[in-house]
């Protein structure tokens, strides 16, 4: 999948699940489960409940996503 096909949207982390998976509420009110991208995992970026994040969604499954950026 190319980058042009993915959907990027802002959200807030609601809950931390096992294996670096998070429950994120998007700007439009939907709640999705998202995992950390490989570069964030490699650089030990910590994500806590309440953090603002950028989530990348695929058009095939809008309930799962990848966290690509944590806002300050």
From Swiss-Prot:
SMART domains per UniProt: S1
InterPro entries xrefs: NA-bd_OB-fold (IPR012340), RNA-binding_domain_S1_IF1 (IPR006196), S1_domain (IPR003029), TIF_IF1 (IPR004368)
Domain of life: Bacteria
Keywords associated with the record: Cytoplasm, Initiation factor, Protein biosynthesis, RNA-binding, rRNA-binding
GO CC aspect terms: cytosol
A GO molecular function held by the record: ribosome binding
Keyword Protein biosynthesis appears in the UniProt entry: yes
Compartmental location: Cytoplasm
Residues in S1-like domain copies: 1-72
Family to which the UniProt record says this protein belongs: Belongs to the IF-1 family.
Oligomer status and interactors: Component of the 30S ribosomal translation pre-initiation complex which assembles on the 30S ribosome in the order IF-2 and IF-3, IF-1 and N-formylmethionyl-tRNA(fMet); mRNA recruitment can occur at any time during PIC assembly.
NCBIfam families assigned to the protein according to its UniProt record, in alphabetical order: infA (TIGR00008)
Its biological purpose: One of the essential components for the initiation of protein synthesis. Stabilizes the binding of IF-2 and IF-3 on the 30S subunit to which N-formylmethionyl-tRNA(fMet) subsequently binds. Helps modulate mRNA selection, yielding the 30S pre-initiation complex (PIC). Upon addition of the 50S ribosomal subunit IF-1, IF-2 and IF-3 are released leaving the mature 70S translation initiation complex.
Protein name as catalogued: Translation initiation factor IF-1
Organism ancestry: Bacteria, Pseudomonadati, Pseudomonadota, Gammaproteobacteria, Candidatus Palibaumannia
């Amino acid at each position: 999948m190319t980058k042009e096909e993915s959907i990027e949207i802002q959200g807030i982390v609601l809950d931390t699940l096992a294996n670096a998976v998070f429950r994120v509420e998007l700007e439009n009110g939907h709640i999705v489960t998202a995992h950390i991208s490989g570069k964030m995992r490699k650089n030990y970026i910590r994500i806590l409940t309440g953090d603002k994040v950028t989530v990348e969604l695929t058009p095939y499954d809008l309930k799962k996503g990848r966290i690509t950026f944590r806002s300050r």
